[in-house]
């Protein structure tokens, strides 16, 4: 039986079971553990928080690599343990519609890296291609992009199991995620330095604007982008989304390339391969070319995307 508060038990489990596999090449563990809430011997010891602490502390023994943990939320203070698994997501538009809000407002407890079951995990026997594309688009502009589902042949999510038009869209999403790595990494460094998350509610940057508190599915993706994922099925050829663009800046709509004046809410239509993403005028976005297939090493040429504004001097520190 599991005894998380028993030092001898935990040492034996780590030394006998996990450490040998780490020597064989395992980099980190997804501890998808559904144990009882509190330890059976120590009153009020939360098992999830405790296993996070034990596992992370154990990984710190190897100072040649950065410890990384992937487990469920253990309560306040769990931001110390980097990546959180948000649980088994139900496959539905309603579930997708909740995740952008859930993801960004985790900033309020300093939790910056949620990993969701992109596409949903359970309670369906087949995948709606449109819903999966929209979920992947949200994943593209999330801290972690991880497609996942329960074991069911009808829920396979490899890009090539869909029709060619959907396969092409999914492939481009993955390519764009790779391409965005310099920007994401730069913003991750800022998260490390000042605890400002990559994905955060609009009111973090525009606290004086009432609209910033009303747009629940709209969020900042780093310092320079607004993202409002499509979370409902399209009506005809396009899905519509209301997007609030803060005043004080103009904003480039990535899907169309048009420049829109800030200080208004726009309602645009987006085809299945389009995402409501807006880049602040005056921004410099470092990216890789969309031909990149491997993020190892730092020798990939960086493409600098400039979004000009009137009269501004633009700069960007890139890590």
Where do the model's predicted regions map?
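Catalytic-domain carbohydrate-binding cleft regions of carbohydrate-active enzymes
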Residues: 1-275, 279-281, 314-315
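Accessory, solvent-exposed terminal regions and/or long lumenal/extracellular loops of proteins
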Residues: 274-319
């Amino acid at each position: 039986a599991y005894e998380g508060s028993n030092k001898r038990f935990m040492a034996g489990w780590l030394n006998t079971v996990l450490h040998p596999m780490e020597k064989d090449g395992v980099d980190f563990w997804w501890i998808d553990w559904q144990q009882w809430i509190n330890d059976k011997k120590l009153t009020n010891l939360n098992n999830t928080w405790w296993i996070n602490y034990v596992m992370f502390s154990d990984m710190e023994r190897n100072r040649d690599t950065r410890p990384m943990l992937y487990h469920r939320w253990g309560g306040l203070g769990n931001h110390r343990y980097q990546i959180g698994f948000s649980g088994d997501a139900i496959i539905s538009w309603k579930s997708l519609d909740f995740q952008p809000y859930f993801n960004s407002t985790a900033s309020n407890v300093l939790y910056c890296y949620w990993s969701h079951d992109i596409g949903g995990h359970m309670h369906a026997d087949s995948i709606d291609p449109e819903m999966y594309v929209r979920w992947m688009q949200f994943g593209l502009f999330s801290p972690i992009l991880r497609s996942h589902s329960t074991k069911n042949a009808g829920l396979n999510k490899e890009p090539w199991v869909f029709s060619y038009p959907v396969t092409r869209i999914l492939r481009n999403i993955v390519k764009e995620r790779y391409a965005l790595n310099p920007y994401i990494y730069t913003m991750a460094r800022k998260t490390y330095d000042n605890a400002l998350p990559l994905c955060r509610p609009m009111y973090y940057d525009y606290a004086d604007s009432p609209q910033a508190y009303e747009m629940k599915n709209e969020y900042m993706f780093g310092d320079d982008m607004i993202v409002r994922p499509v979370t409902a099925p399209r009506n005809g050829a396009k899905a519509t989304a209301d997007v609030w663009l803060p005043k004080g800046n103009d904003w480039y709509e990535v899907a169309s390339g048009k420049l829109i004046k800030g200080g208004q809410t726009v309602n645009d239509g987006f085809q299945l391969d389009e995402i409501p993403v807006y880049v602040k005028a005056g921004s410099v976005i470092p990216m890789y070319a969309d031909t990149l297939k491997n993020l190892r090493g730092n020798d990939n040429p960086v493409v600098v995307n400039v979004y000009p504004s009137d009269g501004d001097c633009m700069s960007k520190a890139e890590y």
